[in-house]
Amino acid sequence: MSEPTSRRPAYARLLDRAVRILAVRDHSEQELRRKLSAPVMGKNGPEEIDATADDYERVIAWCHEHHYLDDERFVMRFIASRSRKGYGPARIYQELNQKGISRESTEKAMRECEIDWSEMAHEQAVRKYGEPLPSNFSEKVKVQRFLLYRGYLMDDIQQIWRNFAD
């Protein structure tokens, strides 16, 4: 029979928790650190793991060493996922920044992903407003506002009317 979780060493409990978290989806290192340091719900309510900073560092190092944690892979998958959901580069940059990913890593991954953002913006506009896209000023402003909210750059938005004019 396994020993109760309260008697297991903090490192083993942290490692078990990290693997369970990373089994669900990829996380950035900062996200994993935040989740590991948060209290976990036990049978008697929230439980803290009495772990040292060294325990956290060892767990993070183990996850990197065994390829459970890889910020580069996380960034590529995140960009692919968010672009499939119709979000533009500005929004993706901002979300990755919130997840602790450096701007340089994000820019490198964005260059490698080969996504045509103006085509994506056009697809999102057509999905929301239909074909043909509005041509009067007030309706164009609505489309622009929608696409800016979704994270597309103004250059990509303006390309819609230049490249896809009927």
From Swiss-Prot:
Biological processes per GO annotation: regulation of DNA repair
Protein family: Belongs to the RecX family.
InterPro entries per the UniProt record, alphabetical: RecX_HTH_1st (IPR053926), RecX_HTH_2nd (IPR053924), RecX_HTH_3rd (IPR053925), Regulatory_RecX (IPR003783), WH-like_DNA-bd_sf (IPR036388)
Organism the protein comes from: Salmonella paratyphi C (strain RKS4594)
Gene: recX
Localization annotation: Cytoplasm
Protein function: Modulates RecA activity.
Key words, A-Z: Cytoplasm
A Pfam family the protein falls into: RecX_HTH3
Name assigned to this protein: Regulatory protein RecX
Primary subcellular site in the record, as a coarse category: cytoplasm
UniProt GO cellular component terms: cytoplasm
